[in-house]
Amino acid sequence: MIHGIGTDIVHIARIRTSLERHGERFAERILAESEREAWRASRDPARFLAKRFAAKEAFGKALGTGVAVPATLHAVAVDHDALGKPLYRYGDGLQTYLDDRRLNAHLSLTDENDYVVAFAVIETR
């Protein structure tokens, strides 16, 4: 059964401006520790951050908490499976929260020119 859905759109230029203004400190506010190495190696750091931010916003909307405890920016990470499909990873507290409620999340990400869109679905297992 569907617990919730969430979507978010991010203008990459907005992220690029913040990144230029605040540097790595801005990225550290958005990224979980596990995402930071991939961000540093990214060919387009602003696009990378925009995707992560949109994915986390969509997750919070689908969960119904917004980007707040337990679904903070650092508690939610975006990764990819062996085929490149995006997926969520969680900090211990959020993983426990989801397990206790038997919730499972799915993520779709797309980007085109100036925008990134994320769509999240959370279902009951």
From Swiss-Prot:
It catalyses: apo-[ACP] + CoA = holo-[ACP] + adenosine 3',5'-bisphosphate + H(+). Mg(2+) binds at residues 8, 57. Disulfide bonds: none annotated. It is found in: Cytoplasm. Gene3D superfamilies: 4'-phosphopantetheinyl transferase domain (3.90.470.20). HAMAP family: AcpS. Belongs to the P-Pant transferase superfamily. AcpS family. This is Holo-[acyl-carrier-protein] synthase. It comes from Azoarcus sp. (strain BH72).
